[in-house]
Amino acid sequence: MTSNEHDQETVHTKVREGYGAIARQGGSCCGPAKSCCGGGAAEAVAAAVGYDEAELAALPDGANMGLSCGNPTAIAELRPGEVVLDLGSGGGFDVFIAGRHVGADGRVIGVDMTPDMLSKARKNIVVYREKTGLDNVEFRLGEIEHLPIADNSVDVIISNCVINLSPDKPQVWREMSRVLRPGGRVAVSDLALLQSLPPDITKMVEALVGCIAGAVMARETEQMAKEAGFEKIILTEKRGYIEALTEWKDPLFKKILENLPAGSKMSDFITSLYVSAKKPLA
């Protein structure tokens, strides 16, 4: 194993352990179950990033874990009959929402590298079927850098606050290009940097698991998408999410604020970012 491969596996291990604990304990990336993002506040997080009450009410209990930083299904323009892939599907939140959009003739596949999350999501399938009458979702174990998905087999890829966790983001974008059919679409919500974070923050394990330490500049995301062959790339900043977390006095964000330069705000450094792109037809 090379030094780079070792570093990547270390990141995967930390993220897998962190999200495994979240799945078992019912917390969120922001902290344990009693923190701002756990329990009832998960609905507040979802509302703040654009999910409507009807979507949330139709979800199986526990699928919404407060792990969102945007609403990728809102920009995905999902159509009946499409095959959708969710990168880092967690408890199945966006998979179940997308399933209602694509209907009985469509299919939604969630990929996650954390066995505890997969177990939680698969248990939720039963309730999803009862609520919707649909049998159109599945969950697979795998890393988003090495997707267990066939070439040219997916119409749309969605992802919600996950790509920042990857230690090899260019490879994630190459994998997205590989599995998408020609003309396929990407609709991603993630966190992005507005300026570089202080080293003390980028070294924090909880900041990595909390989707902060692994974030990159928006222009870097655009460049990775271009190099992977995507076109019609659109980046849209959504700063309200970071401001909302600051107002909710999230414990992780409070700790990060303590390590920022005096007088700085979290929203000076990081933003929620929507990314849409298309794979060329030829």
Indicate where each model-derived feature is located.
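C-terminal lobe and adjacent flexible extensions of AdoMet/dcAdoMet transferase-like proteins
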Residues: T2, K226-A282
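N-terminal auxiliary segments of SAM/dcSAM-dependent transferases
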Residues: T2-V45
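Conserved alpha-helix/loop element of class I SAM-dependent methyltransferases that forms part
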Residues: G39-V83, D94-H101
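Class I SAM-dependent methyltransferase SAM/SAH-binding core
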Residues: R79-H146
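Hydrophobic beta-strand segment of the Class I
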Residues: V84, I157-I158
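A short glycine-rich, Lys/Arg-flanked "PGG" loop and its adjoining helix->strand segment in the class I
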Residues: P170-R185
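Short, glycine-/aromatic-enriched active-site segment of Class I SAM-dependent methyltransferases
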Residues: A192-I212
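Short alpha-helix
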Residues: A213-G229
